[in-house]
Amino acid sequence: MELKIARAIIKHGLEDLYEYSDVDVAIVGAGPAGLTAARYLAERGHKVVVYERRFSFGGGIGPGGNMIPKIVVQEEAVPVLRDFKIRYKPVGDGLYTVDPAELIAKLAAGAIDAGAKIILGVHVDDVIFRGDPPRVVGLLWVWTPIQMSGSHVDPLYTQAKAVLDATGHDAEVISIAARKVPELGIEVRGEKSAWAEVSEKLVVEHTGRVAPGLYVAGMAVCTVHGLPRMGPIFGGMLLSGRRAAEIIHKDLVEEVYAVRA
């Protein structure tokens, strides 16, 4: 029995890693923006992998507002909630409350059911780039416990037509690319203090491509573009993820037509 368990895990786990070493879109971060983008991209037929450094979904959703188990979503994001069949309650002024556990579970299930592959416990260590001018064409990664231990272990690669940084406040992938590939011309300006009403709009407007092959969504947008933070209102995160999916899909389709031409 034990041997069968071990071989089943090794065989099918390694098959998944092999299959998803070459994808259309690699998303880093399984928070609200990353999971939303994954669902909308996967249902458009793109091969999507999501890497999450923790062994759980949701990013900053779980703690709610200062550990009170509710978060807020504004009117504009209600269509996204409906797409994922997430329940919400009106509180007035175009705002709604949502249960954090339900939001996490249904965002993740929606992405998985659409065809995205989510791999937990992955630390993205670097990007792959090609060309002059350069383009991001993939990622380097190790398992999170290896990174946390400080052990010197060479990472493995994932090839991707598009990489989406949805890592939250730290904008980890874009910060690495900005530092190590200065020819990409990326400036990480740093997140500002809170102004929720303004930032909820700006985070969606500034979602998109920051360099060839490299995109940003969610709180990482605030860090890259120097926007205010917003706290436990998550509509902007959902809308940012949806917009990132729309932009990436458009770019990938245009690239296919350009190659055929």
UniProtKB/Swiss-Prot annotation:
Q: In which pathway does it act?
A: Cofactor biosynthesis; thiamine diphosphate biosynthesis
The prosthetic group or cofactor this protein requires is: Fe(2+)
Could you say which EC number(s) this protein's record lists? 2.4.2.59
Endpoints of the signal sequence = none
Residues engaged in binding glycine: 229
The reply on keyword RNA-binding is no
Query: What protein family does this chain belong to?
Result: Belongs to the THI4 family.
Protein name (database record):
Thiamine thiazole synthase
Q: Which organism is it from?
A: Pyrobaculum islandicum (strain DSM 4184 / JCM 9189 / GEO3)
Q: What is the lineage of its organism?
A: Archaea, Thermoproteota, Thermoprotei, Thermoproteales, Thermoproteaceae
